[in-house]
Amino acid sequence: MRSRTSTWFETKVKYQKTMEDGSEKVVSEAYVVDALSFTEAESAIIDEMSVYVRGELKVSGIGKACYGEIFFSDVDDDDKWYKAKLQFITIDEKSEKEKRSSVTYLVQAKSLARALRYIDEVMGKTMIDYDVVGLNETKLMDVFEHHVPNEKKEEKNDVPEYEEQK
């Protein structure tokens, strides 16, 4: 289980999908991408989906996602995404009253019970008191993280100029 904090965008894409029975159908699916802007989010989802789509791909919606963090699972059969709303409990030192602040997370898991277990595993390592006040399965198909392309390829004898033999 690993977690990642970033700027996330929810995107909706429409494309022609080949169904299990071999028929073609136009589907609309939701994905989350890691990006810095709406333009970058659109570019990222087109790049990611172009591998899976043969025909026309239309980005029908982009919106900024409110996820504080996303928990990625390393287990192969964890194929669903759950939206978890947690409330962190703190005590206000001045008024000595309990304060609650809400944060939304996205959790990759096979089932609701496993998603709750993953939340407890990650949050159990912290010193923060919390309550899980909401945990719902989403219609998200996948989450795509930003990958920085390698701009400079390592050369065999990559030596700084001042060390070069002349």
Q: What are the functions of these language-model segments?
A:
Residues E56-K83, I91:
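Extended, compositionally biased
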Residues T7-V13, Y31-V32, A41, I45, ...:
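Short, structured motif recognition centered on aromatic/hydrophobic residues
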Residues K153-K166:
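Short acidic DE-rich linear segments
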Residues K17-D34, V51-R54, D92, K97-Y105, ...:
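A cross-kingdom feature marking solvent-exposed beta-strand/loop segments within repeated
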Residues T104-F144:
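Mixed-charge, glycine-accented linear interaction segment located at domain edges/termini
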Residues R2-V26, D76-R100:
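Short aromatic-glycine-(Arg/Gly/Cys) micro-motifs in beta-strand/loop hairpins
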Residues D34-C66:
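Short, well-structured hydrophobic secondary-structure segments
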Residues D74, F144-K156:
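Short, low-order "capping/linker" segments at domain edges
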